[in-house]
Design a protein with these regions (language model features):
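N-terminal membrane topogenesis motif
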Residues: 1-25, 81, 85, 223-246, ...
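Signature of the first transmembrane helix
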Residues: 7-65, 102, 131-132, 238-259
Length: 528
């Protein structure tokens, strides 16, 4: 075969870099939108985007991974016919799923918008519909490419998709605003960038793939189509169910919160939309740390699986412990930092809508803490799946979902708390999921590090960092305009955290060695 195969660490580094770039572009896309659309427009935007995210996860989370594994196995055996059969059937299956999901969004936008109690979100839903099919096709090609060991088409396609979303989405939104369009059409224009970006990402992936993944003539007898489809579904469905957790909870949250505000507290549809819009400003930042930490956790999971394949449970426990430790070290300062500086950060990012930023600060205070548990959920899900327990994350997700329903009803339905209860219930939900997963790992992975040693130093470091952040912000407010004082405060907190982490040995060479390029990073930090 003439495809280009990268080593695991190099491939993981390429994907991690692409994810970092795409999430940065995503922030540059959504944060300006908040200033342009304010709370009503962002509520319409997220109503469509939350449905899209769930349908996208259901379509693309598991099957491309299953396709990648099957292609990798067949390629290692130099069975070109099997590789082609996997690609063709995987592409057909994903195209069918994408077509169904796109049809639902394009043909039933009014019904979907009504289910979320936001009828003005219908134009955005219709505009976003074709994106599901486009991303499904991209996911099939990317799964095939990754199975051949080449991460470049995936990385390039993701970056192109995010860049197209940023440029076209913001451009359409600005144009419609200048034309005097309503917030519903402006939100539809903004979200049209997602559809355009998906098309651009598919184009880039499709153009790169033939040159980098060419196969010789078929010389083997490919497996039966029914067998390939069964294996795709058997492998992909458990992964899909586990990956759908955050999207499902977010969509459930929106439906429950808006219904409770309208039906229990008696708000009008317009008032409900505005209140939920405030909440989405906090949600935008809440989703950032998990997005950056996800590739870190994912890049460590193959090391766990490889060790278990060798029946080396000690090495598997070390790799699982490193995944959890690095997740905690990254998630705690990110989440707590968002929490203690919620107001200053929001006022920095949303100067055009100061009242909305002020209202959203309360939500971000709790959502920042919740994102710590989201990151733990992602890491622990990966560990449990690597150890052959894919159903346990589903059980913990169901428990968290039940708690979310109960606490939403009790807190959002209380006139004393109202919409403010939504962020608190989100914190409770993800905390329960993370605790259940950690308890399962404690029972099933005896080789893992003790939880006291895992959490003690990061918690202490984060407490000192939070104190430095708040104190630094107060000090810099005397020297700089209040809006800009948060930047040096964040820098001070980051320096304090990193210096103390190295000083007290919170990070070791063994921890970093499991990461892509971790050996070089450990050398630069002079870790032993």
């Amino acid at each position: 075969m003439t495809h280009r195969r990268q080593n695991f660490m190099g491939g993981a580094a390429i994907l991690a870099g692409a994810v970092a770039v795409t999430k940065l572009l995503g922030a540059l896309y959504k944060i300006p939108l908040g200033n342009l659309l304010d709370r009503e427009g962002m509520a319409h935007f997220y109503a469509a985007y939350n449905i899209y995210s769930l349908l996208l996860v259901l379509s693309t989370a598991g099957l491309p991974v299953a396709l990648s594994r099957m292609v990798s196995r067949a390629a290692a055996q130099r069975r070109c016919g099997a590789v082609r059969r996997c690609l063709h059937l995987g592409l057909a299956l994903l195209a069918a799923l994408g077509l169904v999901c796109s049809a639902v969004m394009c043909l039933l936008p009014e019904a979907l918008a009504a289910a979320l109690h936001d009828p003005n979100a219908a134009p955005a839903l219709r505009t976003l519909g074709p994106a599901v099919l486009l991303v499904c096709l991209s996911a099939a090609l990317r799964g095939y490419s990754q199975g051949l060991g080449d991460m470049v088409p995936t990385a390039a396609g993701q970056v192109a998709e995010s860049a197209g979303k940023l440029l076209i989405g913001l451009g359409l939104c600005l144009y419609l605003l200048r034309q005097g369009a309503g917030t519903d059409l402006c939100a539809a224009g903004a979200i049209g960038g997602v559809t355009a970006g998906a098309g651009l990402g598919l184009l880039v992936t499709a153009l790169l793939l033939p040159r980098r993944a060419a196969l010789p003539e078929v010389r083997d007898v490919p497996p039966a189509s029914s067998r390939v489809l069964r294996e795709l579904l058997r492998t992909g469905i458990p992964i899909t169910v586990g990956a759908a957790g955050m999207s499902l909870i977010t969509l459930l949250d929106q439906a429950l919160v808006t219904a409770t505000l309208r039906d229990t507290l008696g708000y009008t549809t317009a008032e409900t939309t505005a209140l939920y819009g405030e909440y989405t400003f906090g949600m935008t930042l809440f989703m950032l740390p998990p997005s950056f930490i996800y590739p870190l956790s994912v890049s460590l999971m193959p090391a766990v699986s490889a060790a278990l394949t060798r029946r080396d449970r000690t090495a598997a426990g070390i790799a699982a412990g490193a995944a959890l430790k690095l997740t905690v070290l990254a998630a705690l300062p990110a989440g707590v930092g968002l929490s203690v500086l919620a107001g200053p950060i929001l006022h920095l990012l949303y100067p055009a809508v100061p009242e909305t930023a002020e209202a959203a600060a309360y939500h971000l205070t709790f959502l920042g803490l919740a994102c710590v548990f989201v990151c733990l959920m992602v890491a622990t899900n990966g560990v449990l799946q690597s150890y052959g327990h894919p159903l346990l994350p589903v059980i913990s997700l169901l428990c968290g979902g039940v708690l979310k329903i109960v606490t939403n009803y009790l807190m959002v339905g209380d006139p004393a708390t109202g919409i403010r209860g939504a962020a608190v219930s989100t914190l409770y939900c993800y905390a329960l999921i993370a605790v259940i997963n950690l308890a399962a790992i404690a029972r099933l992975v005896p080789e893992r590090p003790g939880y006291i040693s895992l959490f003690a130093k990061p918690v202490l470091l984060t407490a000192v960092m939070a104190l430095a952040a708040r104190s630094g912000y107060g000090l810099f407010c005397r020297l700089l305009p209040e809006r800009w004082a948060v930047l040096p405060a964040v820098l001070l907190a980051a320096v304090v955290y990193v210096v103390l982490a190295l000083a007290i040995g919170a990070v070791t060479r063994q921890d970093l060695q499991t990461l892509p390029k971790g050996e070089k990073l450990a050398d630069r930090l002079h870790l032993r």
